[in-house]
Amino acid sequence: MLGIAIRIAQRMGIHSESALSKHSPLEAELRRRLWWSLVLFDTRMSEMADHKTATLAPTWDCKIPLNVNDSDLSPEMKEPPAVQGNSTDALFVVVRSELADFVRHAAFYLDFTNPALKSIVKPGQHEGLVSEAAALENLEKTIDDKYLKFCDPENQLHFMTIWWTRSYLAKCRFLEHHTRHTNLSVPLTDAQRDAAIALACRMLECDTRLRSSSLSKRFQWMIYLYFPFPAYIQILQDLRRRPGSKEAERAWEIMSDNYDTTFVFINKDSDSPFFKAFTRMLLDAWEAREVASSQGGDLKLSIAPPIVLSVRHRVAQVAQNAQTADTQQFGMGINDVPMSMPMPMGSMHNMSGQGRYGMELYPDVLGQIDVNLFDLSAMDWGFQGVDPGSWDPGL
């Protein structure tokens, strides 16, 4: 149905400014809003379906929606309303669209979605020939100056806009970092690995803020659609390789905080493919830290964080239940966890029209993790295994 809607929209010309110029200001603005909502939703669905080509591309010229209130628009108007210099009803839509408009022209995004389209991006895009890392810094400053500085953090819509922006930019930086370093012929330095962990931690911190605040309660249906699993893989694989790195202590703390707000589905379905995959990666990483602790004599390193204690407890519960039921579904030892079918990794992320974050695109992140160990094809990634019908209607 979404594909049909996209094709109808293109036939109507709502992706083209030349076609939109033939309509009244109100009609043109409504069409822009519709096009961008379709594009962002289609991009996320493409990620979840492991489909490489997304509608978010530099092949059309529809402008982002105007930063105006709905009351500023009327059928009688002959000219578009003046753009507001403060927060408006359309704030969240406008900011999301401006971020995505940047990304669809970015080389780090097109490298993963459709490299052939890089040739049609203007050479002067994104502040000239500066690095894309610097361009992302400039984008964040622009968004802050144009929109976020007018926001009230206690307002629900404004809070969502602020932290969605932070989360989106963190994911963009994470992808840009891997674009620069994944295929290098020389091994990554500790500084580069620390930078990757710091970016992954920032993704989880933003995600935790969004999921844990009462101000975002009515947006949970949307937040749960964007789970930052690549950040977990980045962190856990690095912690397995470098259990005593300078970012390790902070990483375990940040993962514990995010786990408390994110993994609500584990108590309902501990036999899910996701639980098995995540549990194995987590406990392997912690085992490496325990080995490093015993070898180095630092007992503080072996104090299990809340996330490890919780997962171990849940594994023990599942093992006990399995024994009681006289089944072989899930053994006590983590090495007994059955994981043996192909894994569509593109569905794991992240990030609202944020580009393709499929883990097959991150061979260096995966390291020694065998991507064929997992079978997540049956997982409802929209709600991480939580039945949408169980949500509070008040959300």
What is the predicted function of each stretch?
Residues 44-47, 51, 105-119, 145-156, ...:
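Intrinsically disordered or highly flexible coil/loop and linker segments, enriched in small
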Residues 23, 29-141:
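Fungal transcription factor middle regulatory core
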